[in-house]
Amino acid sequence: MKRIYLLLSLLTGCLYMQAAIYNVRDFGAKADGKAIDSPAINRAIEAAAQEGGGTVYLPAGEYACYSIRLKSNIHLYLEQGARIIAAFPEKDKGYDMAEPNEHNKYQ
């Protein structure tokens, strides 16, 4: 009886430990290759990070992006046909500056 109770407890715990999936379209990504999707992707990453981790899911499409800021325990899953493309920087928008590094000036 104790073994059955232990087994049920472990199975229940495993179900609750499954990481959530965060679809970037739910956070505003357009995936049309024109709209800048990095803010939506970063919002999905932030939401997953606040819950302790998870999978950020990118359905098929073209995601024009500036900097994407990954965090611990976050997995990016690109569906077949999904591409992240570099967006052309604008005058007042664009990529994060390179962070200082003791080995060279690039990240």
What are these regions (language model features)?
Residues M17-Q107:
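Extracellular/periplasmic carbohydrate-active domains that bind, remodel
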Residues M1-Y22:
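Bacterial Sec-dependent N-terminal signal peptides
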